[in-house]
Amino acid sequence: MYIMKQSGWLELICGSMFSGKSEELIRRIKRATFAKQEVKVFKPAIDNRYSSESVVSHNGTSIVCHAIASPEEIFQYISKETDVIGVDEVQFFDETIVGTLTSLADQGYRVIAAGLDLDFRGEPFGVVPDLMALAETVTKLQAVCSVCGSPASRTQRLINGKPASYDDPVILVGASEAYEARCRHHHEVPGNPK
């Protein structure tokens, strides 16, 4: 009897802010390096919260990465020796990330992507729903609600301590907003048409 090793697949780690997505991505990448696998890690160039050269979790763990402006740049950094490809903050890439990641998985790479599944409005965020549908495995993480301590699946955007309006832009770069994890019942979006 032969044991066949599966070659090439897509794993998605998703959830709200503060749920441990980047931390889980870093953990999986570090495990691959312990197994002597060649890894390459990427994030969108617009993510410069902690470092432009590393994926950094909110608890301070980090791993070196390449900051890229477009998904196609991944192909410039990988080779036949690459085993595992990690991509953080996947929701900030345009729709070409879906084809790029599925192509990489089809070519035999283990692809691990992490990102927010819902935006601050509580609506599906960018390409993440498509990646959820196409991934072989989906890990949905939850944070802890900052109001009541229940499991939190939403990200609350606060501007000057108040919930952001539904009409605010989904992506703010360099703004002075703050975020909290919230459960369904304590997530507030003034002006939400629902």
Curated annotation (Swiss-Prot):
Protein name as annotated: Thymidine kinase
GO cellular component: cytosol
Top EC group: transferase
Stated family: Belongs to the thymidine kinase family.
Compartments where located: Cytoplasm
Keyword DNA-binding among UniProt keywords: no
Coiled coil: none
Sorted UniProt keywords: ATP-binding, Cytoplasm, DNA synthesis, Kinase, Metal-binding, Nucleotide-binding, Transferase, Zinc
The encoding gene: tdk
A GO molecular-function annotation: thymidine kinase activity
EC numbers: 2.7.1.21
GO biological process assignments: DNA biosynthetic process; thymidine metabolic process
Catalytic activity, as annotated: thymidine + ATP = dTMP + ADP + H(+)
Active site, per annotation: 89
Annotated binding of Zn(2+), by residue: 145, 148, 183, 186
Pfam families from the UniProt entry: TK (PF00265)
UniProt binding sites for ATP: 15-22, 88-91
Subunit relationships: Homotetramer.
InterPro entries associated with the record: P-loop_NTPase, Thymidine_kinase, Thymidine_kinase_CS
Entry annotated with the keyword Zinc: yes
Transmembrane segments: none
